Amino acid sequence: MFQDNPLLAQLKQQLHSQTPRVEGVVKGTDKGFGFLEADGQKSYFIPPPHMKKVMHGDRITATLHTEKDREIVEPETLIEPFLTRFVGRIHKKDDRLSITPDHPLLKDAIPCRAARDVTHTFQEGDWAVAEMRRHPLKGDRGFHAELTQYITTGDDPLVPWWVTLSRHNLERAAPDVEATERHDGELVREDLTALSFVTIDSASTEDMDDALYVQDNGDGSLQLTIAIADPTAYVDAGSELDKIARQRAFTNYLPGFNIPMLPRSLSDDICSLRPDERRPVLACRVTIAADGALGDDIHFFAAWIESKAKLAYDNVSDWLEEQGEWQPQNDAIAEQIRLLHRVCLARSEWRTTHALVFKDRPDYRFLLGEKGDVLDIVVEHRRIANRIVEEAMIAANVCAAIVLRDKLGFGIYNVHNGFDPVSIDQAVTVLDTHGVQADAQTLLTLEGFCKLRRELDAQPTQFLDSRIRRFQSFAEVSITPGPHFGLGLEAYATWTSPIRKYGDMVNHRLLKAVITGQAAEKPQDDVTVQLAERRRLNRMAERDVGDWLYARYLSDKAGTDVRFNAEIIDVTRGGLRVRLLDNGAVAFIPSSFIHAVRDELVCSQEMGTLAVKGDVVYRQGDTLDVVIAEVRLETRSVVAKPAA
């Protein structure tokens, strides 16, 4: 009798519309219950039965109820699922498959089946790519996923690499395309094969893309010629290989190996500036004044060169520091090293005064066994030979930025606008609190930004510097010229790594148009979007593989009294994030390991401090000795505690 009662329907509608609702993101716990973190910072309890309808990270709307004087929410509609495409491990029971997502807060296995075009027979422990197909809040009975790609077996030693590349949908191998013949068109090449060009790289490098030559002008100034490998002589714009390079955007450097942007036949052989091999290059010649300033005689041209020596960073550094056994093979090479050293010192001094110089941070290199096991982690400090190459490349990129700006008005530029205007007042307040006077409008200028950076670099600790970095904007890729505040330069356009960066290939083509006087086509905006997105994915992949390898490396140190010196890189609500300075690993120190009484302890992300009973015990940038408390291999996380 009530079935079609309009009054009842109206009452239901009224109750539905009067029920309060909240929108937010589901936060799971390992206890079965969860929370809905609403956009207004408020958190609502989700009881275990309701958590079965949602997944950690889902954005939902939920109805709000009161139960036993406590506000709880019941999930109602799905706005955006947390999981769409994901990687995970297969479970097999009675020929039924399920997959556990590879995520620290997703512990439940999701029923699944293989897509029709996937021929692999999945076994327990296999890794796979899956896509969500059903969700309870979409009216389905439960969660269900479809396996779209087999990655590898559970016991494959290379799991960290293959799983990470699949997670970020990145290529696993070099492009399988043959390079074409060289096409120079109207480009005329100067013959510089008699000059003593040298390359300086890591000893293991095969894709050498820059060679240097210096001439002493006899009046205190030097003439620097930067010769860069010329892959665009072999890769025509719009060709199949060009489309592949554009899609990849960069060579992907992961611990242990790289996945090149171009076929290895090009990157490691045909284009690589190998010693005693005649190679086509794009070159730039410029005068370096005695004070390090770049002359106004910047000249770009095409050439043939023949590198006379493949030098290694450590050997060159040892020789300049008068240590070790290594000697240059002849006087001409020795003279080039001396002149390059002069270029480096002059340019470094000029940049320190007129621009900005990054503080040297060490690189960490994994030494891996044949089965992907970590034998050791080597700290590689930046030495004088690294700085020689860096100064030459920065000079070359400034030259390209000037020429492209003045001749064309466009190119692929690296742009960094310093402080985010939205955050500038907060930055001024923080500076003022620490006794540094600053004006918001001045800080938004290149000159004002550089002045502040020099002041911060002169501080006795990195604390204020690390607090201020939070208010800076991110570097971007732009077709329009603009300043790079981080480098303290008015414009910066890279062209020195065309074997491994697609943006540099684009700039090569534009520079060639300037050289030949032909019309240049302005790059499309979607190129910059692709470059930025691929750079983000490659960095995440490098970090993910690194986390996996660090967890493997440190697992046998857990629970021992092996001490590591660590730097505090962040203060969070729950404790401290630290970097182990001996190997570069990032670990977390829960606040409970620092002080047992929670109410007496305050972790302030805003202030970058951890205080106990009102006294600051640790600040961001401080160093302390730690021991490894626990390594969670399944989530690749390292938990540390202060050493006793």
From Swiss-Prot:
- Classification via Pfam families: OB_RNB (PF08206), RNB (PF00773), S1 (PF00575)
Q: Which GO terms describe its cellular component?
A: cytosol
Q: Which domain of life is it from?
A: Bacteria
Q: What is its main location?
A: cytoplasm
Q: Where in the cell is it found?
A: Cytoplasm
Output one GO BP term. Answer: mRNA catabolic process
Write the Enzyme Commission number(s) for this entry.
3.1.13.1
SMART domains per record: CSP, RNB
Alphabetically sorted, this entry's keywords are: Cytoplasm, Exonuclease, Hydrolase, Nuclease, RNA-binding
Say if the entry is tagged with keyword NADP: no
The record places domain RNB at 189-516
Any one GO MF term held by the record is: exoribonuclease II activity
Q: List the disulfide bonds.
A: none
Entries under SUPFAM superfamilies matching the protein: Nucleic acid-binding proteins (SSF50249)
**InterPro entries from the entry?**
CSD (IPR011129), NA-bd_OB-fold (IPR012340), RNase_B_OB_dom (IPR013223), RNase_II (IPR011804), RNase_II/R (IPR001900), RNase_II/R_CS (IPR022966), RNase_II/RNase_R (IPR004476), RNR_Ribonuclease (IPR050180)
Occurrences of domain S1 motif (ranges): 561-643
Q: Which reaction does it catalyse?
A: Exonucleolytic cleavage in the 3'- to 5'-direction to yield nucleoside 5'-phosphates
User: What does the UniProt record say this protein does?
Assistant: Involved in mRNA degradation. Hydrolyzes single-stranded polyribonucleotides processively in the 3' to 5' direction.
NCBIfam families of this UniProt entry?
Answer: 3_prime_RNase, PRK05054.1, RNase_B
To which protein family does this belong? Belongs to the RNR ribonuclease family. RNase II subfamily.
This protein's name: Exoribonuclease 2
State the organism named in the record. Answer: Pectobacterium carotovorum subsp. carotovorum (strain PC1)
Q: Which gene encodes it?
A: rnb
